[in-house]
Amino acid sequence: MKKKFLIIQTASIGDVILATAIVEKLHSYHPDSQIDMMIKKGYEGLFDCHPYLNKVIAWDKKNNKYKHLFEIWRSVRSEHYDLIVNVQRYAATGFVTAFGNAKETAGFDKNPFSIFFTRKIRHQIGVPGLHEVNRNNKLIEHITDEVPMRPGLYPSEQIFEDVKCYKSEEYICVAPCSLWFTKQFPEARWIEFLNLVQDNLKVYLLGGKDDVDVCERIKNQAFGKNIVSLAGKLSLLESAALMRDARMNYVNDSSPMHLASSQNAKTTAVFCSTVNDFGFGPLSEDSVVVETRGKLDCRPCGLHGYKKCPKGHFKCAYDIDINELVNRL
């Protein structure tokens, strides 16, 4: 009888993408299994035509949040999963996991409901060399092995055809924005970098609808005439499909970095206030983290970043050598 698995990750886009490494691993060991995933409503498009997922459960956190969660919980109970894997540390999804009527449940010890999980793993952040995919993989080691796989998203053939028009000449992608100020390389510094990019390279600025203004300012203030802003114009999977074949992708410590990892696309990730040891860095074979070489007592200042630099100087961004970005071209 085929196994039934549910993976729960209802946090940000980047976290959801990283959780797909579990999908990859479970499928590699249990290719005939049913794998479902519970995510935040609005991110379903990431999994259009996904070859390994049976069903995506989308939790609406904005409208009747807990009423909808209760409905999801009842649905989950009716599935009789063999294993529910919860990679989050929050009570709401911990409840669904603990009382989801599964034969086995796995999650981290920091989840308030972990006392009811059948498999509880210590959650560690800041351990050198321990990536989020390694942390998450520990939840399924007992039915797979200790080696995590890279996250994977699967743009359809039609999506690749739709973005083909942007690939007629050699190009790079730049995703200049982040939800957090201290995780975002400043606009002036992106402009400084783009002014050093050779004119024969097409530059595509990527981002969501909220990033349109920033991308337009960067495009208009940079010297290059070969810069095109696609902010707000591409879906997440279309962006991933474009990033896959780029000469290089320049990103912050944010979701576009994880999109690039999902395609094993060449990546240069600029880390400002955060550090790679948190375990959320790029995973592509050709990927590097660019950061300040100076010693700053205030860095890292937090796991997720802040709306402004707590010290007021933002040296972790302004002290980065722009040539390290240029040298990756």
Regions found by a protein language model. Give the residues of each.
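Catalytic machinery of carbohydrate-active enzymes
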Residues: M1-L329
